[in-house]
Structures are given as C-alpha cells and as structure tokens.
Amino acid sequence: NWDPVGVPSAIDSAIIGAGTVTVSQSVYPASLIVSSGATLVFTNWTTKLYVAGDITIQDGGTMTVPPSFLEGQMSNRVNLACSNMTIEPFGLITVAGKGYWVTNGPGRGYLYQRGSGGGYGGTGGRPYPDGILPVGQRYGSLSAPLDPGSGAGHYPSTNYTIHAGSGGGAVRMQVSGTATVDGTISANGESSKGEYGAG
C-alpha cells in the first residue's frame, strides 16, 4: 500500500494512500504522508521510522501498533525521527490500551475482589473497598516515559479477565524542527470494562 509500490528508500517521498501498511523493520524515506483513511502499524520494539524531511498525518490518517501483549512477548511502539511533524485535525497517533495486557507488566495490577490498577510513572489505583491492599507499582519515568504501561488486575477468576483494562503503549517522537499537533496523540491505559475489573 505504499505509493509508489515498494519499501521507500532515502530518496523517496513516501505516501500511504489507503489501507494499512505494517512495518517490522526500520525504514528511511525522505518524507512521509499518511493519507486520510490510511494506517501505519509499527511492530517490533526496535522498528523506527527515520525521515530526513517531514512527516504528515492527514485528517483521518492513523499511526498505531498491534494489540496489547503478555510479558515475554514482543512489545511494540510508535518510534520515529524527522525534521518536522504535522498531525492534522482528526489525524491520530494511538497506542491507547496497547501496552501490557491485563495483569502483565512490571507494574501489573493485582487479583482482588475488584482488582487494582496497573502502574507506570505512578502507582496504580487502589481497589475498592480494600484500600489498604497492594497496587500496581511505579516504574519508568513520569516526565519522560519510554516504556509501555502495565495491565490492571481483576477478580481472581478468568471469567473476569475481560473486565480489566490493558496498559497504554509507548510513543517516541524525535522532532528536530517543529511539531504541530492539531490532531491527537493517545497513550492512555484502558478503563475498567465491567464489574470486578480495574483499569
């Protein structure tokens, strides 16, 4: 779905015109446009988009990663470097809920009656009504986050796994010039999806 067809080189101005393009290794185009309705998916933690010029995510274009993952599985992040970055209104970079899966990660939530929240730059939320019980622990950096967030806990039964939320994913942007964000960058963890599950 690259336009023109083929993995872009350092002399190419790349356009994702429609559909979904998945990158599993680093690429080095001269510039990049993610068009309206098109999606660029990053897989592998080390995959990086090195763009000598500008990156533009148009209205309705998206950069993202695959769904949340378990401890020991391959993690993913949106990882890019460019001169200038523009995210137009309704353009989107989202890794929301695409960090560690439920009860996974260094700051994973615990299994209680209603579970506890997963941690990252801060500790996870305490379970109600058992406010003295442990919660997902803090790790990483609050001011310069680099890692995925951990998944929340739930009632200790696999029947309630789907009620808890996964952690937020990771986005790293190195922009040497100007970053103009009129759209959205989202790395939120998931909220609770039902009774006895935390977010």
Regions found by a protein language model. Give the residues of each.
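Glycine-centric low-complexity/flexibility signal
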Residues: 54, 62-199
